[in-house]
Amino acid sequence: LICNNEGETLLELGADAAKGGALSMINVLNEKTNPVLLCAYNNDSKFTLNFYALPLQKNQLKGEGTLAAPYQITCAAEFFQIDDQPSAHYQIMNDIDFGGAAFAGLQKAFAGSLDGGNYALTNLFLNGSGLFREVVDTAKIKNITIKQPVMALSDRTTAAGIIANTMRGGFTDDGVELHATISNIHVLSPIIAGNNFTGVCGGLIGEASLFVGMSECSVLDADIQVLNA
């Protein structure tokens, strides 16, 4: 546990199957400029990295997570916190440089909203997954440009896309349709590679099903190197 001076828990770390297995390393990066806490999870020699902006705060994101006052995302470390509340609403406030570190995608099914504000995500290296593993229910993702992302796939992945591996709507308990949508999403010059990958892949979504909407989206100059897909 990492706590503040009042004894309030700021961060709880430990083995986490959703994040990749055993917690194997904790380190502080960029200590003199924009410090972040790096946590590495090891699962059969495959590592998942999580980053947290420093200093830690009880609630690191500005905003309230509502549609009227979404959480504000200004850096990669804050983007990773979407996993903490995957049904909340988020707004990207500026271009974000992910620094090229391997990122295994947000692990929890995303059912909230993310407005990219027409800003760009750069230096994104996706290890085995898109930005989101799952986009579900009434999730809405819009107004994002992703420049030259690289996605490395393995035989452990059955579906993969730069935005999400899978995307699906559904039904409420009363039978009301739930529609998941993406709009105004543009992926520029992606590289998708995986010699042992035998699933389905796409520049935006790997596999879409059941009440999914896409509008004004594009993928330009894609280099897809998955011969067995």
List the model feature ranges, each with a label:
Residues 1-229:
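Surface-exposed repetitive/solenoidal architectures
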